[in-house]
């Protein structure tokens, strides 16, 4: 799911791949420092669509850029792109309170078994990862024969590892958390939904939120059924390569995508990677819908912004710190979370 640095030269020939390389995070040495401090390489962001700014201008004077139209005007306008039918962008769709709620759920509840994460393949189901990271615990291979792992306090590590068992800190595992799945579980090895796997239903509050935002993209007379969700976790330098979300049965139903945390660049391509993609900012609280023809469009995340001057999460950090202490705020300072809710059947 996450992009490898090893990409063939042939891939550079597509418009989508060129855009990925244009916006990806690269470092360059700062000549001002003798120890050769590295800084993010400047990039040209002038061509990015900024729906936050577009929304402000529209609310002030009703003006829209060429190729952009408004599909719905309520308390929060919904924007569309003329040559990408089925794509909807809702800026600031989630309040700060809602953003804080779903950040906390994404870190505490969503990785809990029976939900699966990228860690399952190596460590099996992991309970209470976030709390264990807060408490500086270490995951130790407790049983070499059955590959069972257990969290220990740091003071107990020497005793726990006397049999040369492997260990890894909970804080490292939290930072390496890349995805979790809610509702019907997605099998990444088979690239399909496995209804035989144990699972819990998606939380009611998240279902209702998804239904509310999905309504504008639904066929007339139908209601969105949230049956599965994938939560993506991005850290510094992480990307999500160009891909299609094509494992659901009915592409007329939208994917509801909620952005939380650091600002990102989103690429929306066409049905071929040769089609030049639209590049746009995604900020915390934005919601994107992709339905119908838009489900056939390649899309990805080539960059997240984690610097204080570019992440655009000052208010979110303050709210998180006030509500829940510094640990959530410290995590989100260098992270982005994306919740994608889907109707599977």
Swiss-Prot record:
Q: In which tissues is it expressed?
A: Mostly expressed in siliques, to a lower extent in roots, seedlings and rosette leaves, but barely in cauline leaves, stems and flowers.
What is the superkingdom listed in this entry's lineage? Eukaryota
Q: What function is annotated for this protein?
A: Dioxygenase that catalyzes DNA N(6)-methyladenine (6 mA) demethylation to modulate gene expression and regulate seed germination.
- Per UniProt, the enzyme's principal EC class comes to oxidoreductase
Q: What happens when the gene is disrupted?
A: Elevated DNA N(6)-methyladenine (6 mA) methylation levels. Plants lacking ALKBH1A and ALKBH1D show delayed seed germination associated with dysregulation of seed germination key regulators (e.g. FUS3, TPC1 and SPHK1) due to a high 6 mA DNA methylation state.
Is DNA repair among this UniProt entry's keywords? Answer: yes
Cofactor-binding details, from the entry: Binds 1 Fe(2+) ion per subunit.
Which reaction is the catalytic activity of this chain?
Answer: an N(6)-methyl-2'-deoxyadenosine in DNA + 2-oxoglutarate + O2 = a 2'-deoxyadenosine in DNA + formaldehyde + succinate + CO2
Q: Which cofactor does it need?
A: Fe(2+)
Name of the featured protein = DNA N(6)-methyladenine demethylase ALKBH1A
State the similarity comment.
Belongs to the alkB family.
Which annotated residues bind Fe cation?
243, 245, 299
Q: Which organism is it from?
A: Arabidopsis thaliana (Mouse-ear cress)
The entry's localization annotation reads: Nucleus; Cytoplasm
Q: Biological process (GO) annotations?
A: DNA repair; regulation of seed germination
Q: What are the alphabetically sorted keywords of the record?
A: Cytoplasm, Dioxygenase, DNA damage, DNA repair, Iron, Metal-binding, Nucleus, Oxidoreductase
């Amino acid at each position: 799911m996450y992009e490898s640095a090893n990409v063939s030269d042939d891939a550079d020939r597509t418009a989508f791949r060129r855009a990925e390389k244009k916006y990806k995070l690269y470092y360059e040495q700062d000549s001002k420092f003798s120890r050769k401090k590295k800084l993010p390489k400047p990039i040209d962001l002038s061509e990015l669509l900024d729906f936050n700014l577009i929304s402000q201008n529209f609310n002030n004077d009703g003006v829209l850029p060429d190729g952009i139209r408004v599909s719905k005007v309520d308390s929060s306008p919904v924007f569309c792109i003329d040559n990408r039918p089925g794509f909807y962008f809702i800026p600031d769709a989630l309040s700060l309170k809602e953003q804080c709620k779903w950040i906390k759920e994404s870190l505490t509840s969503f990785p809990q078994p029976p939900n699966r994460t990228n860690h399952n393949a190596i460590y099996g189901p992991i309970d209470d990862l976030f709390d264990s990271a807060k408490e500086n615990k270490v995951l130790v291979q407790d049983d070499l024969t059955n590959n069972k792992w257990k969290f220990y306090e740091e003071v107990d590590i020497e005793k726990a590892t006397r049999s040369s068992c492997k260990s890894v800190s909970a804080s490292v595992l939290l930072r390496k958390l890349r995805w979790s799945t809610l509702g019907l579980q997605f099998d990444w090895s088979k690239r399909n939904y496995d209804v035989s796997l144990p699972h819990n239903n998606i939380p009611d509050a998240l279902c209702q939120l998804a239904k509310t935002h999905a309504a504008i993209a639904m066929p007339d007379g139908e209601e969105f059924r949230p049956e599965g969700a994938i939560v993506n976790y991005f850290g510094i330098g992480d990307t999500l390569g160009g891909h299609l979300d094509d494992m659901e049965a009915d592409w007329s139903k939208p994917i509801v995508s909620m952005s939380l945390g650091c600002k990102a660049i989103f690429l929306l391509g066409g049905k071929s990677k040769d089609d030049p993609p639209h590049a746009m900012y995604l900020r915390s609280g934005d919601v994107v819908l992709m339905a119908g023809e838009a489900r056939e469009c390649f899309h990805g995340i080539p960059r997240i912004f984690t610097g204080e001057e570019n992440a655009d999460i000052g208010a979110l950090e303050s709210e998180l710190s006030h509500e829940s202490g510094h640990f959530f705020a410290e995590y989100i300072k260098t992270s982005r979370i994306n919740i994608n809710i889907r109707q599977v059947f």
